[in-house]
């Protein structure tokens, strides 16, 4: 008995047309997108925690308490009083103790040691979480097509970050050179790379939150001009973060505690006192804080322009993303002024650094939604 036919089906003696074959996107190995996204979200949270702990390590002047770089054996802290005394004796050999911390007893040293040890230990945890996740998904063949390289990159950069951290600490482990902290250039490099890793993780998390088909379709409605503006906004925010790291490295946030002027002047006193001239832009605390303020004003002004343009987007979620990014930036500007007026106490300073993470990620999300808009339903 022949099968039933639809009343709209064309009648013929020929064989029925073969079912449509899936396209390249449909045939691609989907992998475990949800599980990988969750794993990257854990890494993202750990990197944010690392930035906060790193900031607290700097604010408590703890970064030079461990004078040796032992990536493996350093995971074990001192276990006996003799071990603690040996570590303290090593610390007593560097300039920070001789010039700044001779008042310290062993109990005081333990306090700063634990901060630095915790910071390094968290780095080891991040490396372990990345390795277990990546190789687990790789062996299970659950990585989506085209994603292997993208998932390797955070791990490679994490390894580089560990080396940069050692390089940074080495700049402050001096004897007779007068260094009592790490070099501000190296601190800025260390923090900048942390934000690069954070940005890569955030972008991947956003991509994995949608299917390849959805992303491919969304690219057809990319808001190219707005994407370019958001890219500039993101880069300017990143530059401001690097300058903020220079301010932190020089402890420049406590030098001038008035606003909007600096010591009653528009430009701080002696802005070009160092020689050669270029050093002032990186090593003069007054000029570096002045530059941080000026770039902050530029970032806000540019943000107003981008926000007004973003509000005209045809996509509701894109508009919301720009509203969120601008709101966070406005709050960050206010918090920056408060940080100056209160001479950068550690509680406000660390909140200022954490909010910088929020501003950076929210601007990045707005940029992502320009590249991959989410269509708004006609029904609203």
From Swiss-Prot:
Reactions this protein catalyses: Fe(II)-heme o + 2 A + H2O = Fe(II)-heme a + 2 AH2
InterPro entries assigned: COX15/CtaA_fam, HemA_synt_rhodobact, HemeA_Synthase_type2
UniProt name for this protein: Heme A synthase
Keywords: Cell membrane, Heme biosynthesis, Iron, Membrane, Metal-binding, Oxidoreductase, Transmembrane, Transmembrane helix
Transmembrane portions of the chain: 36-56, 125-145, 151-171, 187-207, 227-247, 287-307, 320-340, 344-364
Membrane topology: Multi-pass membrane protein
PANTHER family in alphabetical order: CYTOCHROME C OXIDASE ASSEMBLY PROTEIN COX15, CYTOCHROME C OXIDASE ASSEMBLY PROTEIN COX15 HOMOLOG
Function, in words: Catalyzes the conversion of heme O to heme A by two successive hydroxylations of the methyl group at C8. The first hydroxylation forms heme I, the second hydroxylation results in an unstable dihydroxymethyl group, which spontaneously dehydrates, resulting in the formyl group of heme A.
GO biological process, any: heme A biosynthetic process
Annotated gene: ctaA
GO molecular function annotations of the record: metal ion binding; oxidoreductase activity, acting on NAD(P)H, heme protein as acceptor
NCBIfam families: HemSynCtaAAlphapr
Compartment list: Cell membrane
Cofactor dependence: heme b
Keyword Membrane assigned: yes
Organism of provenance: Ruegeria pomeroyi (strain ATCC 700808 / DSM 15171 / DSS-3)
Enzyme class: oxidoreductase
Enzyme Commission code(s) on record: 1.17.99.9
Annotated binding of heme, by residue: 292, 352
Pathway: Porphyrin-containing compound metabolism; heme A biosynthesis; heme A from heme O: step 1/1
């Amino acid at each position: 008995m022949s099968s039933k036919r639809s009343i709209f089906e064309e009648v013929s003696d020929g064989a029925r047309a073969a079912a449509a074959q899936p396209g390249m996107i449909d045939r691609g190995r989907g992998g475990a997108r949800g599980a990988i996204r969750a794993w990257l979200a854990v890494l993202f949270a750990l990197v944010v925690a690392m930035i906060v702990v790193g900031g607290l390590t700097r604010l408590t002047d703890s970064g030079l308490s461990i004078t040796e770089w032992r990536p493996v054996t350093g995971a074990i802290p001192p276990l006996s009083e003799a071990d603690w005394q040996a570590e303290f004796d090593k610390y007593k050999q560097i300039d920070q103790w001789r010039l700044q911390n001779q008042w310290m007893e062993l109990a005081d040293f333990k306090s700063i040691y634990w901060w630095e040890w915790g910071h390094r230990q968290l780095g080891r945890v991040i490396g372990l979480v990345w390795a277990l996740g990546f190789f687990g998904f790789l062996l299970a063949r659950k990585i989506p097509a085209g994603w292997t390289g993208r998932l390797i990159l955070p791990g490679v950069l994490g390894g580089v970050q560990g080396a940069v951290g050692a390089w940074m600490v080495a700049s402050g482990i001096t004897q007779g050179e007068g260094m009592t902290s790490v070099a501000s250039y190296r601190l800025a490099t260390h923090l900048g790379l942390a934000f690069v890793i954070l940005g890569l993780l955030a972008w991947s998390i956003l991509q994995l939150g949608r299917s390849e088909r959805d992303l491919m379709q969304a690219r057809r409605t990319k808001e190219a001009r707005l994407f370019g503006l958001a890219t500039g906004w993101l880069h300017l925010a990143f530059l401001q973060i690097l300058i903020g790291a220079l301010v932190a490295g020089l402890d420049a946030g406590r030098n001038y505690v008035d606003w909007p002027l600096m010591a009653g002047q528009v430009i701080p006193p002696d802005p070009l006192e160092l020689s050669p001239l270029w050093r002032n832009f990186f090593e003069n605390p007054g000029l570096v804080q002045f530059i941080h303020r000026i770039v902050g004003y530029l970032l806000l002004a540019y943000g107003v322009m981008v926000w007004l343009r973003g509000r005209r987007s045809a996509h509701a979620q894109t508009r919301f993303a720009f509203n969120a990014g601008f709101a966070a930036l406005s709050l960050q500007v206010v918090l920056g002024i408060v940080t100056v007026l209160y001479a950068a106490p550690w509680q406000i300073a660390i909140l200022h650094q954490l909010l910088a993470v929020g501003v950076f990620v929210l601007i990045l999300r707005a940029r992502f939604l320009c590249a991959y808009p989410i269509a708004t339903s006609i029904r609203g």
